[in-house]
Amino acid sequence: MQLETQDALYVALELVIAALAVAGNVLVCAAVGASSALQTPTNYFLVSLATADVAVGLFAIPFAITISLGFCTDFHSCLFLACFVLVLTQSSIFSLLAVAVDRYLAIRVPLRYKGLVTGTRARGIIAVLWVLAFGIGLTPFLGWNSKDRATSNCTEPGDGITNKSCCPVKCLFENVVPMSYMVYFNFFGCVLPPLLIMMVIYIKIFMVACKQLQHMELMEHSRTTLQREIHAAKSLAMIVGIFALCWLPVHAINCITLFHPALAKDKPKWVMNVAILLSHANSVVNPIVYAYRNRDFRYSFHRIISRYVLCQTDTKGGSGQAGGQSTFSLSL
């Protein structure tokens, strides 16, 4: 099958995003595994996020490419490809929310934080979030799908009897997953609420940090702390902004498709392609925002790349610069 120019460009960009997502997030997982200083509850959530983003690069993006080309297959195989994409992206969203809640607890109740957020509890929360992601992503298999419409023209040769079980359909996302599910359940129920909650949490974090800083005497140490907290607040605001930038366009298009089908019918194909690329690109920037701006992660990245990529001998001892208290300090 020969690809049109814009389809070929879309596939090429998706493959680049997939490669970057896998490389960056594997590096995050390796850094946590290699450094005892990074093995904290906060970073367990980051590893969950990185794992979801690795899976986006390895599976979700190839599946998205496959269903964008519209090849013919049976309905449930196509539905599985579409739903698996939803499972992984939903897991990534939940992991982002878990990190936000974890950071709020760390700054709101610092003295009780270690007792509240233990490694065992963090792993349990991660397991629950993945189960929820699978439940949400696979909901169309319970009947909320477009099987009747997609297989309405299927008949057995000669007798005219409808046979929907083995009917080949053109495997496009909108042919198997109804927009009502994507808008009402996925967007309004599972994407928009976490986004709004994260915005509120990060605003709260900023307010608590500012309130604490107002009670500090501006000595040299206090000035350094103030600069670090301001930098952290800016980084947290950037997290919310990138999340919205990456995810809202594709859901906005879905809303237009559902509520204004006549308008959506004439939309250029490249518009949806760009929106999908943006949503997948979130898996690339997550390691940059959450990990690359952390001093301990950078040190561990340097060691891993030097030893296993550049094959250089490690001449420095130790496991990093910091301990558990500054696990997610965003200072540079």
UniProtKB/Swiss-Prot annotation:
Originating gene: Adora2b
**List of glycosylated residues:** 153, 163
Q: A single GO CC term, please? A: plasma membrane
> What name does UniProt use for this protein?
Adenosine receptor A2b
- What organism does this protein naturally occur in? Rattus norvegicus (Rat)
Instruction: Give me the residues lipidated as S-palmitoyl cysteine.
Output: 311
Cite the source lineage.
Eukaryota, Metazoa, Chordata, Craniata, Vertebrata
Q: Does the keyword Disulfide bond apply?
A: yes
Amino acids binding adenosine: 174, 254, 279-280
- Membrane-related topology note: Multi-pass membrane protein
Q: Name one Pfam family in it.
A: 7tm_1
GO BP terms, alphabetized: adenylate cyclase-activating G protein-coupled receptor signaling pathway; cGMP-mediated signaling; G protein-coupled adenosine receptor signaling pathway; mast cell degranulation; negative regulation of cell population proliferation; negative regulation of collagen biosynthetic process; positive regulation of cAMP/PKA signal transduction; positive regulation of catecholamine secretion
* Stated family: Belongs to the G-protein coupled receptor 1 family.
Disulphides: 78-171
Cytoplasmic membrane side: 34-43, 102-121, 204-235, 292-332
- Extracellular compartment residues: 1-8, 68-78, 145-178, 260-267
Key words of the record: Cell membrane, Disulfide bond, G-protein coupled receptor, Glycoprotein, Lipoprotein, Membrane, Palmitate, Receptor, Transducer, Transmembrane, Transmembrane helix
